[in-house]
């Protein structure tokens, strides 16, 4: 029989806030302002952020520190499919818009592990129950605070995070191989 793990609410292990409402800070592109990069909905997939899909914006005033993303933060889409991703890089002036939640670890939890958990089926089921029957399937920060996750030993979390990360890398490599084989096949066929 497996050991019984204590469940904790997400708000107990992380500080959760909404991203920045961009149009309150934006300026005309011709005007001088501080330049910021922001995460787009399409840039978040499979627990990763595609840096090529980030957008750039000039801000007429300085953005508060709480909106600036740092290595170790997690962002989560507030609309389906509710994808989460770990910020595993350093990039100055990176912000998340208001259609994302910013999740910062405040307790004995591994950020990478938590990002995988947030993308898991158990969390998806909890989120789907919370938005059931509503016309707009946008989750509120208060919903995220109530999500229940299993408390594990931090060493165990790190082991699971490494394992899951390896699976993701392996899947990504397989996708690349398939793409290269497709290109190779097309090159051969075009020369026949």
Give the role of each language-model region.
Residues 1-23, 27-28, 150-192:
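Non-catalytic DNA-recognition/assembly elements of restriction-modification systems
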Residues 11-26, 42-71:
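Sequence-specific dsDNA recognition surfaces
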Residues 28-36, 55, 67-69, 86-98:
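Short, surface-exposed loop/turn microsegments at beta-strand edges and helix-strand junctions
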């Amino acid at each position: 029989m497996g050991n019984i793990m204590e469940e904790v609410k997400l708000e107990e292990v992380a500080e959760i806030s909404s991203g920045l409402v961009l149009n309150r800070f934006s300026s005309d592109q011709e005007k001088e302002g501080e330049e910021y990069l922001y995460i787009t909905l399409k840039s978040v997939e499979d627990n990763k952020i595609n840096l090529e899909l980030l957008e750039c914006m000039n801000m007429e005033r300085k953005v508060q520190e709480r909106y600036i993303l740092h290595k170790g933060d997690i962002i989560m889409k507030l609309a389906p499919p509710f994808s989460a991703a770990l910020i595993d890089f350093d990039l100055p002036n990176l912000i998340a818009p208001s259609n994302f939640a910013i999740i910062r670890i405040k307790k004995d939890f591994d950020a990478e592990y938590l990002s995988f958990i947030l993308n898991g089926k158990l969390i998806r089921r909890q989120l789907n129950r919370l938005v059931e029957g509503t016309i707009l399937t946008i989750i509120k920060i208060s919903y995220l605070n109530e999500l229940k996750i299993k408390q594990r030993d931090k060493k165990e979390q790190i082991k699971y995070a490494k394992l899951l990360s390896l699976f993701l890398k392996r899947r990504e490599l397989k996708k690349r191989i398939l793409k290269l084989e497709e290109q190779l096949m097309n090159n051969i066929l075009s020369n026949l």
